[in-house]
Amino acid sequence: MEYEHITHSFEPVYDENSRILILGTLPSVASRENNFYYGHKQNRFWKLLAYLLDEPVPETIDEKKYMLFKNHIAIWDVIQSCDIKGSSDNSIKNVRPTDIRKILETSDIKQIYVNGNKAGALYKKYQLPLTGMEAVTLPSTSPANAAWSFERLCEAWSRILVNL
């Protein structure tokens, strides 16, 4: 598989009431095809959030945004553009990071969480020096992270509820 240069095509989802910010790396191939975050049918992000928030699992983009806003959750990614092979985070190179400072300046973010180790490492390298705000790395909801059962993910991710 060849490297492809990808530029992030989604706006961040947040408002002035957002209390936590969840950052991924960048949209997967399936997410880009579906025009929204965590679009791969086997990614457990939306099912996990719905379970933790005691909400129905959102199906449409509008339902996903509604659940995020209702629960004061912002989402975006750490990468604005990069070279990548398919959806493999391990292949990411030539990173241009997003600038999350506007979100932090115009919302009520209490804590930043990153979805997976690669997002955590990139946050630490690129965003932490700009924001001074430590991020909590959570296990990836990606189907590639099959070692983590849904139950284990729920337990690990339940820490986001403290800041909601």
Which residues does each PLM region occupy?
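Short, surface-exposed acidic-centric catalytic microdomains
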Residues: 30-91
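Internal catalytic-core helix/loop-beta-alpha segment
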Residues: 70-118
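Short loop/turn segments at strand-loop or loop-helix junctions that form parts
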Residues: 25, 78-80, 140
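C-terminal capping/extension of enzyme domains
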Residues: 1-19, 41, 88-97, 101, ...
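Short catalytic/ligand-binding loop motif for oxyanion handling, primarily in non-cytosolic enzymes
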Residues: 29-32, 83-86, 120-123, 143-147
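A general structural signal for short secondary-structure boundary/capping elements
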Residues: 66-71, 118-126
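Short, hydrophobic/glycine-enriched beta-strand segments
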Residues: 19-25
